[in-house]
């Protein structure tokens, strides 16, 4: 019996040894994890921002969608970041990004001819050059810096239409953004319609891919960012919510239901850039949009990220 007991204990110990070691490893892992992470700053920032965004929605009687990424710290601020909104003219940056991906810089000197019949509802630049046409580079400038709708339509046609633009987005991993129509129809999005919509997170991720990633050459990225930095339509939106000395590259958009959007890259002094997307709309189809809503939301985001001039 004594021998039997010893055999049992030894045998049992051998069988249990791997389990004990695994349990110890697990406990050690759990212990380290608990030591290393008090509630992540990211979560705390999101919760703080969320309360403020709710108050902002009430103040403006609007709906907000926000995604911000500090590329230096990997911290985010999100609010309705996976909900769909009409993207309106913000998509023009992504379309130019897709154009750059598919063409050399030299190919952008190709001149595109068009007629007065191609002009749509907003053509501050293209209407001046019906007789001569414009190069792809000039169309990109008109589309991003002046939000010229005809310029954007001509770029979309160069890509092969909305369906081919969508394929380009899928190739960079954007499975959410849903191009379906040309300007100006794409700005009319009824509640529940997914055409020409995206989410704040998807737009931010695609913007980051084109403007800050390595999918484009440095020369192409610089060209895209330069157009956004010299944008003429965004002074009262994200730009109005950051300190004056910070650099901002952005693209705005507006549409039915008071849609007002801005997608941007922000460079605080001596820090890595912040990617910020703010989308908004209202309940009534004929509602007016609010530029100040976007500026106020920007201030909340930067406060939540604890980004300063220092």
Please report, for each region that a protein language model flagged, where it lies by residue.
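Mid-domain, small-residue-enriched loop/turn segments at the edges of structured enzyme/sensor domains
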Residues: 153-212
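Structured C-terminal helix/loop/strand segments within mature extracytoplasmic catalytic/sensor domains
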Residues: 30-54, 58, 76, 157-158, ...
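Conserved catalytic neighborhood of penicillin-recognizing serine enzymes
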Residues: 120-155, 162
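A short, well-structured edge-of-sheet supersecondary motif
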Residues: 48-81, 110-113, 266
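Bacterial N-terminal signal peptides that target proteins for export
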Residues: 4-17
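Active-site SXXK
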Residues: 74, 86-114, 143, 276
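Short, glycine/proline-biased beta-turn/loop segments that scaffold the active-site neighborhood
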Residues: 105-129
